């Protein structure tokens, strides 16, 4: 008997966008669009008849906005939701509110050129729906108690990293922490960073997220945390009490000058179908920081970061993978564990301790 298809409900007030998304999803063998609604009011009528596995939701609609609808869904019957947002500052801020309210993924809707969207973003949409269908939504609403303190060929990070020029340098007192995450990571990072005191090692973080969204994400985390959390800029120095978020649409690598660590924010091809890529970050940390670093891989779909975490371990770094029970999607940590890349497997509520204590 064939596996059951992932049933999807689309909610978007644009008839053209609905048509494009339906065409993409129904052309995918393991996905079926069970309905499409122009706004949340019509969506609720459809939900009264049939409940989908995944909801793809616009956040800016008439009659009832997507955030209000999302909160209603999560309070009544938690369901994986993929946010389909415009690539604007307003769209980014609203989408981050949606992630905080329980959405699991963000995709950007076409602004111009639907043909290009069909070519460039079809795989992104399909991957987001599959990730949502595999997510553990009950972990999205969890919060830790306050602490006592485009489809392209799947390139590896070799396409970005400079050629090897020697072993990682060890004669420095600075310690850095590299974190990589994807689906469910916005909530997980909030839980970890808000548990940290002002005095802690410098951090570099890759969260898979569209361009223009990471600035709003960093600003939000900065307002919630005791530490400083900016979006990274090229040549920023990694300092204690600072967590640099890789910009969407760019790769971020760690480099070193003397006893200090810096980031390089660069263009480049998709790596493991992502930009920024966790592997690009982790493998650069392995090269330039070695035993002075800790690598942490958290909730997310796919295998981005698994190889890089193994390289960090082999270079002398301490390494951590989030455990299955606390992940929204146990994909990236699972692949790292398969490679024997993780020295420790930890629940989300303990990961901040791995940052504070090697």
From Swiss-Prot:
Predominant location: cytoplasm
Chain ranges of the Response regulatory domain:
7-124
Domain CheB-type methylesterase, first and last residues per copy: 170-358
Q: Tell whether Cytoplasm is among the UniProt keywords.
A: yes
For biological process, the GO terms are: chemotaxis
Query: Which PROSITE patterns does this UniProt record tie to the protein?
Result: CHEB, RESPONSE_REGULATORY
**Mod. after translation:** Phosphorylated by CheA. Phosphorylation of the N-terminal regulatory domain activates the methylesterase activity.
Which EC class, in a word?
A: hydrolase
Protein family (similarity comment): Belongs to the CheB family.
Question: Which HAMAP family does the protein's record reference?
Answer: CheB_chemtxs
Tell me the domain comment. Contains a C-terminal catalytic domain, and an N-terminal region which modulates catalytic activity.
The protein in question is named: Protein-glutamate methylesterase/protein-glutamine glutaminase 1
**Species the sequence originates in:** Pseudomonas savastanoi pv. phaseolicola (strain 1448A / Race 6) (Pseudomonas syringae pv. phaseolicola (strain 1448A / Race 6))
Gene behind this protein: cheB1
